[in-house]
């Protein structure tokens, strides 16, 4: 199963594609989509969507996952992050790809073992879980962590269905 994870942001959106075969995970690709702060907001969102649509067309994921937005004291930043996240959700929906959504602490716990893990710990564990992955940057590492989290959750759900059936 091909899964794609996203770490949304208006300035930088990370993406990561993995293949899940039972409990085995392997790295397929990752990257970061960047937009220029000097550009008009609508143009930045359009460029983000165009890049996401191309990535989804290229890798044809069966499922997607996105990190939830954490609010902060800067309402403008939170709003822009929410807009970028909306574009990510729209791109997946237009491609008819189902999306799992995960709080950052759930992603950290799934990958590192503790919900309070630091960014560098997440990056280190992504490299362990996906040997050979050349990370395009911290946002791409986070996106891969989101994809790994979704793979674990899907595997758990399948196991539960087998037990119940």
Swiss-Prot record:
Gene Ontology biological process terms in this record: DNA recombination; DNA repair
Binding site for Mg(2+) 2: 67
Record keywords: Cytoplasm, DNA damage, DNA recombination, DNA repair, DNA-binding, Endonuclease, Hydrolase, Magnesium, Metal-binding, Nuclease
Residues that bind Mg(2+) 1: 7, 139
Protein origin, superkingdom: Bacteria
Active site (UniProt): 7, 67, 139
Disulfide bond positions: none
Reaction(s) catalysed (UniProt annotation): Endonucleolytic cleavage at a junction such as a reciprocal single-stranded crossover between two homologous DNA duplexes (Holliday junction)
Gene Ontology CC annotation, any one: cytoplasm
EC number(s) from the headed UniProt entry: 3.1.21.10
Known cofactor(s): Mg(2+)
Biological function: The RuvA-RuvB-RuvC complex processes Holliday junction (HJ) DNA during genetic recombination and DNA repair. Endonuclease that resolves HJ intermediates. Cleaves cruciform DNA by making single-stranded nicks across the HJ at symmetrical positions within the homologous arms, yielding a 5'-phosphate and a 3'-hydroxyl group; requires a central core of homology in the junction. The consensus cleavage sequence is 5'-(A/T)TT(C/G)-3'. Cleavage occurs on the 3'-side of the TT dinucleotide at the point of strand exchange.
Record family assignment: Belongs to the RuvC family.
Subunit details: Homodimer which binds Holliday junction (HJ) DNA. The HJ becomes 2-fold symmetrical on binding to RuvC with unstacked arms; it has a different conformation from HJ DNA in complex with RuvA. In the full resolvosome a probable DNA-RuvA(4)-RuvB(12)-RuvC(2) complex forms which resolves the HJ.
Protein name as catalogued: Crossover junction endodeoxyribonuclease RuvC
Native source species: Rhizorhabdus wittichii (strain DSM 6014 / CCUG 31198 / JCM 15750 / NBRC 105917 / EY 4224 / RW1) (Sphingomonas wittichii)
GN (gene name): ruvC
């Amino acid at each position: 199963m091909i899964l794609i994870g996203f770490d949304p942001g208006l300035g930088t959106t990370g993406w990561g594609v993995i293949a899940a075969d039972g409990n085995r995970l392997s790295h397929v690709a990752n990257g970061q989509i960047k937009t220029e702060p000097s550009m008009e907001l609508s143009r930045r969102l359009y460029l983000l969507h165009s890049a996401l649509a191309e990535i989804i067309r290229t890798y044809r994921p069966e499922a997607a996952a996105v990190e939830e937005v954490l609010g902060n004291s800067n309402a403008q930043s939170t709003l822009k992050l929410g807009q970028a996240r909306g574009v990510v959700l729209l791109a997946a929906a237009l491609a008819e790809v189902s999306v799992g959504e995960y709080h950052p602490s759930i992603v950290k716990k799934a990958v590192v073992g503790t919900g309070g893990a630091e960014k560098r710990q997440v990056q280190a564990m992504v490299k362990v879980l996906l040997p050979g992955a050349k990370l395009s940057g911290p946002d791409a590492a986070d996106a891969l962590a989101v994809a790994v989290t979704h793979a674990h959750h899907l595997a758990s759900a399948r196991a539960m269905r087998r037990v119940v059936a």
